[in-house]
Amino acid sequence: MAELTALESLIEMGFPRGRAEKALALTGNQGIEAAMDWLMEHEDDPDVDEPLETPLGHILGREPTSSEQGGLEGSGSAAGEGKPALSEEERQEQTKRMLELVAQKQREREEREEREALERERQRRRQGQELSAARQRLQEDEMRRAAEERRREKAEELAARQRVREKIERDKAERAKKYGGSVGSQPPPVAPEPGPVPSSPSQEPPTKREYDQCRIQVRLPDGTSLTQTFRAREQLAAVRLYVELHRGEELGGGQDPVQLLSGFPRRAFSEADMERPLQELGLVPSAVLIVAKKCPS
């Protein structure tokens, strides 16, 4: 049976004549499939229906084939013979094949668009994951910097406490030296005049014992206690510093000043008392002190 030309087939499938001619020309008359691909890809172009300026037969510098010449308007056959007409059944069969080809092309285009959409979605998710990872890295860097800052502040605080302890030790050494000088410069005690010989050794008055150390127990507000031995001539400030350095973090961790109290008799030690030796405050040889938070002045 006679075959429809590419142009006739496109027109039979419902494409406008001008658009079909343009598709064949721009694809170099490579056949109906190439023309249909072009038509489906450019169906939404605003200039798709604009006519070509050059003759259809000379597109891309190519001479049309004999079958294409038969489909060009105004061109006759080389021998001048007429083209046999298609029967209605042949025309319907060829139209059916063309429609199936169009449907196949449509399915291929939909599958391609679906693959492209899936690829765009994968790209979007990948970019989202990369952005989330970048944010997490930034957060980790900030947390690391904050931890380093806390460690630096802690080291500076410990260094400051060490300087305070060293100063207290120097002050204690100076006071010990001062005490030693003043005690040595005191005149020797006057010997009492001899009295009557006691009738029994048990009647002699007890000798007062001098203590060089004292044991201090400090009760904290949470019910726990600290126990430490100090020299009798150390200042009460040394006890307060020891408490501030060793009490738990939940009690302030050395951040707030503390008030020292004695239980029996009840007494609150003042700042002036902090400069006095433990033996002078009556805390030798042992004593129990109570810690309370110092009220702001």
Curated annotation (Swiss-Prot):
Database matches in SUPFAM superfamilies: UBA-like, Ubiquitin-like
Record-given protein name: UBX domain-containing protein 1
Residue stretches of biased makeup (Basic and acidic residues): 86-122, 137-177
UniProt modified residues of type Phosphoserine: 199-200, 270
Pro residues bias: start-end ranges: 186-199
The organism's place on the tree of life at top rank: Eukaryota
Post-translational modification N-acetylalanine, affected residues: 2
Impact when changing residue 13 to T: Abolishes binding to 'Lys-6'-linked polyubiquitin chains and ability to inhibit E3 ubiquitin-protein ligase activity of the BRCA1-BARD1 heterodimer
Assigned keywords, A-Z: Acetylation, Coiled coil, Cytoplasm, Host-virus interaction, Phosphoprotein
Coiled-coil residues: 87-172
Effect on the protein of changing residue 219 to A: Does not affect binding to 'Lys-6'-linked polyubiquitin chains and ability to inhibit E3 ubiquitin-protein ligase activity of the BRCA1-BARD1 heterodimer
Subcellular localization, as worded in the UniProt entry: Cytoplasm
Ranges where the record places region Disordered: 41-211
Subunit architecture: Interacts with MAVS; this interaction prevents MAVS oligomerization and thus disrupts the RLR signaling pathway. Interacts with CUL1; this interaction inhibits CUL1-mediated degradation of NF-kappa-B inhibitors. Interacts with BIRC2/c-IAP1; this interaction prevents TNFalpha-stimulated RIP1 ubiquitination and subsequent NF-kappa-B activation. Component of a complex required to couple retrotranslocation, ubiquitination and deglycosylation composed of NGLY1, SAKS1, AMFR, VCP and RAD23B. Interacts with HOMER2. Interacts directly with VCP. (Microbial infection) Interacts (via C-terminal UBX domain) with nipah virus protein V.
Gene (UniProt): UBXN1
Region (Interaction with BRCA1): 43-297
Species annotation: Homo sapiens
Function in brief: Ubiquitin-binding protein that plays a role in the modulation of innate immune response. Blocks both the RIG-I-like receptors (RLR) and NF-kappa-B pathways. Following viral infection, UBXN1 is induced and recruited to the RLR component MAVS. In turn, interferes with MAVS oligomerization, and disrupts the MAVS/TRAF3/TRAF6 signalosome. This function probably serves as a brake to prevent excessive RLR signaling. Interferes with the TNFalpha-triggered NF-kappa-B pathway by interacting with cellular inhibitors of apoptosis proteins (cIAPs) and thereby inhibiting their recruitment to TNFR1.
Domain UBA residue range list: 2-42
